[in-house]
Design a protein with these regions (language model features):
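Alpha-solenoid helical-repeat scaffold
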Residues: 1-210
């Protein structure tokens, strides 16, 4: 349905769309494409590389850079988490361009964790507050209406949405583990050294228990 407008969306991101609300929308659309249809994203990247007369890797690097740079345009926690999931989906990779942007991807991921994680005061562990469980039934007080069919449909849709179905914490852990296995311990450590030590410390706190 959105296919005809995607080149325009891609161009808007690369050229740094100046209106924050529009840029936020563009990044949200591209995040969903990247996360949920990788093969289509690859063909779009190939098409845009021809239009921009650039190598695909170079264009991908430019897109990630602009994404990281304009992350503050995204004000909703859902959008922050979507961006983190989308960029993390590029890992594991031995592509030098993606490795070059690894620091930015981790920065966005940790920012995303700050937006969506809540601490359990009893256990001191963190959990992703955006996750919706199949089993969870909202508690209805006497003053509230029970959920309507539309509410139930909304929940079923939400359960198919990675933002509500995938734990950002778990996703980061699995992607970093896969990257470590791909590069080996030494290569992975070199990559982690490109990330600010404060960000690494925050990441370790969020991933306690994994």
């Amino acid at each position: 349905m959105f296919q005809p407008i995607l080149p325009c969306v891609f161009r808007g991101i690369i050229e740094g769309e100046r209106y924050p609300v529009v840029m936020s929308t563009y990044l949200g659309v591209m995040g969903r494409v990247l996360l949920q249809n990788t093969s289509f994203f690859s063909s779009l990247l190939n098409e845009m590389a021809h239009k921009f007369n650039q190598e695909m890797d170079q264009l991908l690097g430019n897109m990630i850079e602009m994404w990281v740079d304009r992350m503050d345009n995204i004000t909703q926690p859902e959008g922050r988490k979507l961006s983190a999931l989308a960029l993390l989906s590029l890992l594991p990779s031995d592509n030098s361009v993606i490795q070059d942007k690894f620091c930015g991807i981790i920065n966005i991921s940790v920012e995303g964790l700050h937006y969506v994680m809540t601490e359990d005061p009893e256990t001191g562990t963190y959990k992703d507050c955006m996750l919706i469980s199949h089993l969870e039934e909202p508690k209805v007080t006497e003053d509230e209406e029970p959920p309507t069919e539309q509410d139930k449909r909304k929940k079923m849709l939400a359960l198919k949405d990675p933002v509500h179905a995938v734990s950002l914490q778990q996703f980061i852990y699995e992607k970093l583990k896969a990257q470590q296995e791909l590069l080996g311990e030494q290569g992975f450590q070199s990559l982690m050294e490109t990330v600010d030590t404060e960000i690494v410390t925050q990441l370790q706190e969020f991933l306690q228990g994994f």
